[in-house]
């Protein structure tokens, strides 16, 4: 779980760097909930969650304040809308993630089969998992199954890439036709329908932010892009997921080690979109406030012990009094 959260944080920072702060915003929210759902989280991860909450609040205030200015850019108004309108935010995240996923399917066929392809597939896994977690109450069962299926496909592709089964001149290359499913429509009809309804029923459309690719910003995507599904020989492929877990784990460790040095990666677990409890903003604040107070109490106790070592009784008494006051406030 810790390695998953660390990877999500690294991905969020990448999106911030390329001007897609709203994607990073929701990935950070997802990372906080991943960390808080871990009962045995380390102090480092607790501190990371606190830092993320501060970053999230600062981003909301910055966007909210700038969007209210008379000469503010239209994109700021859009981002402010995406922060406060969860239905529009869900559609935007779905639209972006499916665009990225579809682009990576084409790259799996044509190449290059480089480290960025692997990183992008992990990015798709994190984005799909984020959507399932943050909006699980507002996503149909059909869409949920569809997104979970694509997470499995991404893991299968990562395993094949790690073992050299895709893009290697000495091994069997990917036959793109193997993953075309004639039984399904090319487009994801459920999400396409949601997007159309949203645009028809709201005068203030969500536009101007959906990128054509991961590195460009503020280009509109009018509809969910064409989606090439991958379901021929699904049973055979899905049975290989568990067998290929070691190869996937090794690949993830290489990616996380390059991106962030927060914790040692462990074998990735299945995205827990429906397993984690969702917290309200007030609940998150209370949890982090309690953790912060406990950490402060520990520091004050250390100061008191240090003062006692030097027989500085007044300072020791003062520090212990502060610690006791904080303890009583919990």
Curated annotation (Swiss-Prot):
Record note on what altering residue 320 to E does: Abolishes dimerization
Residue ranges of the region described as Interaction with VSP60: 37-68
Coiled-coil zones: none
Region (Disordered): 187-217, 233-280
Location, primary (coarse class): cytoplasm
Modified residues (Phosphothreonine): 195
InterPro entries: Vta1-like, Vta1/CALS_N, Vta1/CALS_N_sf, Vta1_C
Region (Interaction with VSP4) location: 290-330
Record GO biological process: late endosome to vacuole transport; late endosome to vacuole transport via multivesicular body sorting pathway; lipid transport; protein transport
Annotated region described as Dimerization, given as residue ranges: 280-330
Note: Present with 4400 molecules/cell in log phase SD medium.
Cited function: Has a role in the formation of the multivesicular body (MVB). Required for the sorting of lipids to form intralumenal vesicles and for fluid-phase transport to the vacuole. Required for sorting the plasma membrane proteins STE2 and STE3 into the MVB. Acts a cofactor of VSP4, promotes the oligomerization of VPS4 and stimulates its ATPase activity by 6- to 8-fold.
Family in the record: Belongs to the VTA1 family.
Subunit composition and interactions: Homodimer (in cytoplasm). Interacts with VPS4; the interaction requires the dimeric structure of VTA1; 6 homodimers of VTA1 appear to associate with the dodecameric VSP4 complex; the interaction is ADP-dependent. Interacts with SNF7; the interaction requires DID2. Interacts with DID2. Interacts with VPS60; the interaction occurs at he endosomal membrane.
Protein name, UniProt field: Vacuolar protein sorting-associated protein VTA1
Phylogenetic placement of the source organism: Eukaryota, Fungi, Dikarya, Ascomycota, Saccharomycotina
Gene it is expressed from: VTA1
